[in-house]
Amino acid sequence: SELKVATQTGFVRGLSLPVLAGHVSAHLGVPFAEPFLRPEPVKPGAEMWNPNLNIWVPSGRVGAFXFLTVTLFGESAGAASVGMXLLSTQRAILQSGAPNAPWAQVQPAESRFPFVPVIDGEFFPLGVNKDEGSFGVPGFSKXXESLINQAVPHANDIYTDWQDQDNGGLPLTGNPTXPHN
């Protein structure tokens, strides 16, 4: 059914959609709106601080699902979080990250640099992971081929062993003891 919510700047249209646990309010053009309240955006990435908030199982209705399967997908640090969730589940898909990676277990006090992008001190999630480790670093570009990528075309093919960061990097192809061609 159609919903109308009054705001300071007028009405916002929305829909009440049926789901297994009841109804969900969806307001058009208002991301992260609170249902039945004046639509206001929540803090960006609020659930990113506790990834378990993104996992929802309808308590009391599990029997309706017969064989309940939950797929958790995460890349990079998200994959490390998915791996941590494996401690209480059976299977998961990890992409470029693992819970036993040294960086996945670093305490905030030990962290040498903040994650980017950060707006007003809060993590701001983006929807891409190409060159994610160099985002915000001078000389690198997310939108086009950067000068550094043009000058060193094989830069992305060099693997750094994070257990031994001073080893100079190992090429991913060819003879690992010879310089990369």
Curated annotation (Swiss-Prot):
Catalytic site positions: S76, E132
List the protein's name: Acetylcholinesterase
**What is known about what this protein does?**
In venom, its toxic role is unclear: it could result in less musculatory control by rapidly hydrolyzing acetylcholine, or that it works synergistically with alkaline phosphatase (ALP) in paralyzing prey through hypotension. In muscle, it terminates signal transduction at the neuromuscular junction by rapid hydrolysis of the acetylcholine released into the synaptic cleft. In liver, its function is unclear: it could serve as a safeguard against any diffusion of acetylcholine from synapses into the circulation.
Show the segment(s) annotated as Disordered: 162-181
Assigned GO CC terms? extracellular space; plasma membrane; synapse
**Tissue note:** Expressed by the venom gland. Is also probably expressed by liver and muscle.
Modifications after synthesis and translation:
The N-terminus is blocked.
Where does it live in the cell?
Answer: Synapse; Secreted; Cell membrane
What Gene Ontology terms describe what this protein does at the molecular function level? acetylcholinesterase activity; toxin activity
What span is annotated as the signal peptide, if there is one?
A: none
EC no.?
3.1.1.7
Q: List the catalytic activities from the record.
A: acetylcholine + H2O = choline + acetate + H(+)
What domain of life does the UniProt record list for this protein's source?
Eukaryota
Question: Which membrane topology describes this protein?
Answer: Peripheral membrane protein
Sorted keywords for this record are:
Cell membrane, Hydrolase, Membrane, Neurotransmitter degradation, Secreted, Serine esterase, Synapse, Toxin
Pfam families per record:
COesterase (PF00135)
Q: What family is this protein classified in?
A: Belongs to the type-B carboxylesterase/lipase family.
In the record, biological process GO terms are: acetylcholine catabolic process; choline metabolic process
